């Protein structure tokens, strides 16, 4: 499989064993170029071993196809991802294959594992390929892995693998001035330990010929001239504000700023023990969500979301404070009027504009395939329903489906990773002609026939803009940005265009740097990064040592009943936090049906949802780990009562006490008879 001249140009330093970043536009063949580097590496390096890291599960199989096409049959290739379930250990798989394609999270777990079959060291690989390497920053999994690499490099302890980064959009890191953008690019190079960021120079004209940009159009609409449904929602929010008796609370309903305000109010109220204030804040957030949905899709979709929320409140809450009863009555008193307004209210101008775009594109001769990008799973689900209910869209042969993340929350729909793969394949095969997608499809998704991309009212950064645009792969493709005239989304898209130009200037400036100056700068940045990481680790250690675990009580976030102590908690696989006290079971009830988690795990499977037996608040779910059933707690459902007051932590990693790793023998032997066995 031959490379194009511009691909040859960008991989030359990598063929010499140097660490580089390949910067090519989406659709220009970064993966094929990387596969060729891997092939040459295995052919020339004694006992070479390659690992390809991706940040999305669906990219594992997509990349495997590309690498297998490039490699000779005698090179063994395997894939590992979070949806594989029971499998051999990561270490065993790595040691028995020449090339491994996996999600970065699995490599990180293997690096930290103490099990011989699972554990692996970076030195066991001779080449690391980092797909979408612009994510190598801050505390991402990519950067955690590469920080380990840098620590070993600066210690000069052992030979290290070659690094090859791939990106279409290094970004500006939030910078709006050239020097800030240059600093961001240099930091990315330092994090990946690269000596060059490579893009075509001599073969640039050939790149443009093979990879033309889609035609961009701004499709702008006006706001609803009248909005009785939205006005009534805001009136109800005003009534809740009156109950709160907080005149300083800003009433910028339907904005992200307002959402942040009520989220903070909810946290502050929980820590102050103000149950009713917390409940009002929670419900205000739901009404604000309804305004978001109403602005994006239809009033009936917003009302359906509110109805689902209040139905769940009724069926799950076994104990209610006065505020909850008042809020339920408020909704009940107005839901019929809201229903009438939703049924006869004006159509959303954004949907009318979207219909015109789709009719024009899909009504043209030829085979059209498109992707609509939207902000949330909820709006993706609502858009799909709307698409299926428009007779005129059916007449032009639109066959839509959703492509969303594999999460699981009570507030939104979700897809299994198997579902994702099937949808992507059906889109490739032409069984489906239109995807309604969240950001899960922005990066790496390679469908050559896709010729229409619509960004539907999105407020994102320049990287997301470049990535979404790059899904339009076919010739004469159209990239539509659909938003309300004068909206924040429109202003942000214009800013993104300016930032894309700034990014290109910053990369060019870094490429022109004197090699010695570049090396010195990278070395300084790497040393500074490790110092900062060590300082953060020391800070975390101090933070986690503030209190003894047995001095911290665990309270239900809703009813504030004490249900355990910090000393009851253990960590499983680094991310799940379980309560190992056998007496804890008296404080919760369990649903009969297991929760849906859209992965199959190696050592455990999910059980039922667990709820506070006093008030019905959802705390988490059961984990059946190596036949032992353990309750997993969500940090958002637990309030911590410390010797200095109540705390609602955002993450378990930020609680003010240490949580040891779960040891099945030590933690379960004494009370095994009392624990539930599968």
Curated annotation (Swiss-Prot):
A single GO molecular function term of this UniProt record = ATP hydrolysis activity
Which residues hold Zn(2+)?
A: 556, 559, 612, 615
Q: Which GO terms describe its cellular component?
A: cytoplasm
Annotated EC: 3.6.4.13
Q: Which residues form the Helicase C-terminal domain?
A: 353-514
Organs and tissues of expression: Highly expressed in mammary tissues. Expressed in liver and testis. Expressed at lower level in spleen, embryo, mammary gland and breast tumors.
What is the name of this protein?
Answer: ATP-dependent RNA helicase DHX58
Q: Explain the purpose of this protein.
A: Acts as a regulator of RIGI and IFIH1/MDA5 mediated antiviral signaling. Cannot initiate antiviral signaling as it lacks the CARD domain required for activating MAVS/IPS1-dependent signaling events. Can have both negative and positive regulatory functions related to RIGI and IFIH1/MDA5 signaling and this role in regulating signaling may be complex and could probably depend on characteristics of the infecting virus or target cells, or both.
Where does the Helicase ATP-binding domain lie? Answer: 11-188
- Where does the RLR CTR domain start and stop, copy by copy? 542-669
Top-rank lineage group of the source organism? Eukaryota
GO BP: cytoplasmic pattern recognition receptor signaling pathway; defense response to virus; innate immune response; negative regulation of innate immune response; negative regulation of MDA-5 signaling pathway; negative regulation of RIG-I signaling pathway; negative regulation of type I interferon production; positive regulation of MDA-5 signaling pathway
Q: What induces it?
A: By interferon (IFN), virus infection, or intracellular dsRNA.
* TM annotation in the entry: none
Keyword Ion transport attached: no
Among InterPro entries, the record links this protein to: Helicase/UvrB_N, Helicase_ATP-bd, Helicase_C-like, P-loop_NTPase, RIG-I-like_C, RLR_C_sf, RLR_CTR, RLR_Helicase
Note the SMART domains from the entry.
DEXDc, HELICc
Q: What happens when the gene is disrupted?
A: Embryonic lethality at a high frequency. Adult female that survive show an enlarged uterus filled with fluid resulting from vaginal atresia.
Query: What the record says about its domains?
Result: The RLR CTR domain is capable of inhibiting dimerization and signaling of RIGI and also facilitates binding of dsRNA.
Q: Which residues form a coiled coil?
A: 489-546
